[in-house]
Design a protein with these regions (language model features):
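Extracytoplasmic copper-binding redox domains, predominantly the cupredoxin/blue-copper superfamily
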Residues: 1-89
């Protein structure tokens, strides 16, 4: 799956992935010299996954461990107003 950040917002706010097996996220940070990452949250607010923070313009491939089926909010650790939803089936 691909998640894109541009103008301090995720342009991809709804993504689907596989439940119960590891998957990858290609995270494209299109904001010049601006730090972003993707952080996936559990229902209790704790981190299910926290990707490396890096400055754009660049792309990182995140290796996400297996997570149970469900809906997970994701955000940028640096800019918490950047949000989206990951659905694992």
């Amino acid at each position: 799956m691909t998640i894109i950040a541009s103008q301090v917002a995720f342009t991809t706010t709804q993504v689907d992935g596989p439940a119960g097996k590891p998957f990858t996220i290609a995270f494209e940070n299109n904001d010049q010299a601006t730090q972003h990452n993707v952080e996936i949250k559990k229902s209790d607010g704790s981190d299910a996954f926290k990707g490396q923070i890096f400055a754009g313009v660049a792309t990182k491939i995140y290796q996400v461990p297996a997570l149970p089926a469900g809906t997970y909010p994701f955000n940028c650790s640096v800019h918490p107003s950047m949000t989206g939803t990951l659905t694992l089936k």
